[in-house]
Amino acid sequence: MSSQYSNVENLSPQTIRQVMRELQEMETTPPEGIKVLINESDVTDIQALIDGPAGTPYAAGIFRVKLTLNKDFPQTPPKAYFLTKIFHPNVAANGEICVNTLKKDWKPDLGIKHILLTIKCLLIVPNPESALNEEAGKMLLERYDDYSQRARMMTEIHAQPAKCAAGAAGDSKDDDGPSTKKHAGLDKKLQDKKKEKLLKEKKRMLKRL
């Protein structure tokens, strides 16, 4: 899912400065519900935490997303992935995100902030017509209650704050870099409490079945 190498050396100094400036602005004045995670050693590897929007099955969850800039950025769009597992029509099994902004509607003057806001909006209004997860797309259209319950359960299992804090800053899999170790032990007590809450919620859901 992630690139094996950095594209920093392939980007123009102007593009690097532009990306760093935008990331620093978002760090200072973050968009509502979005926290950018800056990797100063590789601006082509951008991660952010997105709060699940209220009133959706993703509410109360925190989702880690990753943008990977290619050497032709901003002439071509970055790749976008959910590193946090999620049940959503427009997110593939490998986490890749399908949204028109990153495909046919891409424009070079669209910035990182716009992309992250678009991804957040996708949590509010999924597009089942261009589903990468066909099961989720069909369920959303035909059995919304089942879709909502499935998405909510995935959120409770995978998108809790402690899990996001423990996620790898470089990748969702086998990255043992300094950032991973730095976050891996955060808030163990909070994580234990979330596990207890999840078990109680599962019991309640089983009773309703």
Curated annotation (Swiss-Prot):
InterPro entries with a match to the protein in the record: Ub_conjugating_enzyme, UBQ-conjugat_E2_core, UBQ-conjugating_AS, UBQ-conjugating_enzyme/RWD
EC number from the UniProt entry: 2.3.2.23
One example GO MF annotation: ATP binding
Extent of Basic and acidic residues compositional bias: 171-199
Region Disordered: start-end pairs: 164-209
Record's catalysed reaction(s): S-ubiquitinyl-[E1 ubiquitin-activating enzyme]-L-cysteine + [E2 ubiquitin-conjugating enzyme]-L-cysteine = [E1 ubiquitin-activating enzyme]-L-cysteine + S-ubiquitinyl-[E2 ubiquitin-conjugating enzyme]-L-cysteine
Top EC class of this enzyme: transferase
Record field: compositional bias (Basic residues): 200-209
GO biological process: anaphase-promoting complex-dependent catabolic process; cell division; exit from mitosis; protein ubiquitination
Signal peptide (residue range): none
Role according to the record: Catalyzes the covalent attachment of ubiquitin to other proteins. Acts as an essential factor of the anaphase promoting complex/cyclosome (APC/C), a cell cycle-regulated ubiquitin ligase that controls progression through mitosis. Acts by specifically elongating polyubiquitin chains initiated by the E2 enzyme vih/UbcH10 on APC/C substrates, enhancing the degradation of APC/C substrates by the proteasome and promoting mitotic exit.
UniProt name for this protein: Ubiquitin-conjugating enzyme E2 S
